[in-house]
């Protein structure tokens, strides 16, 4: 049975599993594996669409992939990212969230930022939109943070991240993602918040963990961040299978009699 926002609000201290999925087959596999929540992240821009960052991702693209993921995982709690600038104002955020929830089938939306987006989060929550916050490394504005690197090493950075997480909780977010922050900071934030935290590159002390589907199964062999653990080398296995297929076609081995009518 699909979890509800209330379940996640009461999930503090539980070891929850989030996983990204961007289409029907990956969402179907994630649901079959029993994950607690699926995130249709705007990381699909880089992972699936080949963009250099998440910035080019449009609301229409998010909607397209959210619909597909929902069809693949009808019984799993589904969170969809609000893409870059879709929440520059509350009106824009409400319109984007409405489409992702009503048309896309999402159960909640995620947006990046701390204190600077707290009013937007509050407005969304007041309108009945469940919101997952996101602090630390925020990929949509990574260029302003010096690139894709660890955040919160310096005391002032750590203080900004903590204040941001607290502001999101106060605004009504049902949980907060902590990305690429030191484990000790993630532990402190997790202990200070009453809502659950979701870590990615944030150590073992968060309430939940999230990883990108393609990283978990090793679809891209040349990309392995330090915080990722690969459970399969799917990219290599798929490439080997495709090479064998091509070889057998060229050698006249496939199709054989058993593949013919």
Swiss-Prot record:
One of its GO terms (molecular function) is magnesium ion binding. SUPFAM superfamilies: Phosphoenolpyruvate/pyruvate domain. It catalyses: 3-methyl-2-oxobutanoate + (6R)-5,10-methylene-5,6,7,8-tetrahydrofolate + H2O = 2-dehydropantoate + (6S)-5,6,7,8-tetrahydrofolate. 3-methyl-2-oxobutanoate binds at residues 42-43, 81, 110. It is found in: Cytoplasm. Its cofactor is Mg(2+). InterPro entries: Pantoate_hydroxy_MeTrfase (IPR003700), Pyrv/PenolPyrv_kinase-like_dom (IPR015813), Pyrv_kinase-like_dom_sf (IPR040442). Mg(2+) binds at residues 42, 81, 112. One of its GO terms (biological process) is pantothenate biosynthetic process. Binds 1 Mg(2+) ion per subunit. Pathway: Cofactor biosynthesis; (R)-pantothenate biosynthesis; (R)-pantoate from 3-methyl-2-oxobutanoate: step 1/2. Its EC number is 2.1.2.11. It holds the Pfam family Pantoate_transf. Keywords: Cytoplasm, Magnesium, Metal-binding, Pantothenate biosynthesis, Transferase. The active site is at residue 179. Catalyzes the reversible reaction in which hydroxymethyl group from 5,10-methylenetetrahydrofolate is transferred onto alpha-ketoisovalerate to form ketopantoate. Homodecamer; pentamer of dimers. Belongs to the PanB family. NCBIfam families: panB, PRK00311.1. This is 3-methyl-2-oxobutanoate hydroxymethyltransferase. It comes from Thermus thermophilus (strain ATCC 27634 / DSM 579 / HB8).
């Amino acid at each position: 049975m699909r979890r509800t926002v209330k379940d996640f609000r009461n999930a503090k201290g539980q070891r929850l599993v989030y996983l990204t999925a961007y289409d029907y087959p990956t969402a179907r596999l994630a649901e079959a594996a029993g994950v607690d929540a699926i995130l249709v992240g705007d990381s699909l821009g880089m992972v699936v669409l080949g963009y250099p960052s998440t910035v080019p991702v449009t609301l229409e693209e998010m909607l397209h992939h959210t619909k597909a993921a929902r069809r693949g995982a009808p019984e799993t709690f589904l969170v969809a990212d609000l893409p870059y600038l879709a929440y520059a104002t509350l009106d824009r955020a409400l319109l984007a969230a409405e489409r992702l929830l009503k048309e896309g089938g999402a159960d909640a939306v995620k947006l990046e930022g701390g204190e600077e987006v707290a009013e937007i989060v509050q407005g969304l929550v007041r309108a009945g939109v469940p919101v997952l916050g996101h602090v630390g490394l925020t990929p949509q504005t990574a260029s302003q943070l010096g690139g894709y690197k660890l955040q919160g090493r310096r005391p002032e950075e750590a203080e900004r991240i903590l204040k941001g997480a607290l502001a999101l909780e106060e605004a009504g977010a049902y949980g907060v993602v902590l990305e690429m922050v030191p484990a000790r900071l993630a532990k402190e934030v997790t202990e200070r918040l009453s809502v659950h935290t979701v870590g990615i590159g944030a150590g073992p002390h968060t309430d939940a963990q999230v990883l990108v589907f393609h990283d978990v199964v090793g679809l891209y062999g040349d990309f392995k961040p330090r915080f990722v653990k690969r459970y399969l080398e799917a990219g290599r296995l798929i490439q080997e299978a495709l090479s064998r297929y091509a070889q057998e076609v060229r050698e006249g081995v496939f199709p054989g009699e058993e593949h013919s009518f």
